[in-house]
Amino acid sequence: MELNTHNAEILLSAANKSHYPQDELPEIALAGRSNVGKSSFINTMLNRKNLARTSGKPGKTQLLNFFNIDDKMRFVDVPGYGYARVSKKEREKWGRMIEEYLTTRENLRAVVSLVDLRHDPSADDVQMYEFLKYYEIPVIIVATKADKIPRGKWNKHESAIKKKLNFDPSDDFILFSSVSKAGMDEAWDAILEKL
């Protein structure tokens, strides 16, 4: 599939399936804890400065945000999880919204699960990966903020993440930096393969 990634726009925000776009376009969901760099990932992948707004306040994305890419596919930005300052009730509501989308959306082709290369995956990261494996949803692990770690230590951090996730070697694992754009081509290759 040839994609003009510059031709991208935010299409709509949805709280439940009655608001989802009604068509056949394939979707790739982006999941990760608050402040893992999801907005930066979207902006880097689409060569845009601020199509997805990066927020200094984690937990800002409270809806599913659908991004139209060249009228051929969509990114779906899922609310960041694991942010402590949101009430338990609010977190449960997000959880249900995310689960409904991931388990019932026929357009969904894969989930890009973002983790921070600098840290061990959180319990939420592990739970998300296990959830995707359980429901047999194809998953691409993208380890963000690679520029914050010396290249010589990438392997060590990658191994630690894979061990904690109990990573399935048949899944894609991509080291990514929105600063240097490292991993951008690999991420697109992995995504397009899933469409």
From Swiss-Prot:
Coiled-coil annotated residue ranges, if any: none
Positions bound to GTP: 32-39, 59-63, 77-80, 144-147, 176-178
Residue stretches making up the EngB-type G domain: 24-195
Pfam families: MMR_HSR1
InterPro entries per the UniProt record, alphabetical: G_ENGB_dom (IPR030393), GTP-bd (IPR006073), GTP-bd_ribosome_bio_YsxC (IPR019987), P-loop_NTPase (IPR027417)
Cystine pairings recorded for this chain: none
Superkingdom of the organism of origin: Bacteria
Entry keyword annotation includes Magnesium: yes
Keywords of this entry: Cell cycle, Cell division, GTP-binding, Magnesium, Metal-binding, Nucleotide-binding, Septation
CDD domains in alphabetical order: YihA_EngB (cd01876)
Cofactor(s) needed: Mg(2+)
Binding locations of Mg(2+): S39, T61
A single Gene Ontology CC term: cytosol
GO molecular function: GTP binding; metal ion binding
Single Gene Ontology BP annotation: division septum assembly
Function: Necessary for normal cell division and for the maintenance of normal septation.
UniProt similarity note: Belongs to the TRAFAC class TrmE-Era-EngA-EngB-Septin-like GTPase superfamily. EngB GTPase family.
Name of this chain's protein: Probable GTP-binding protein EngB
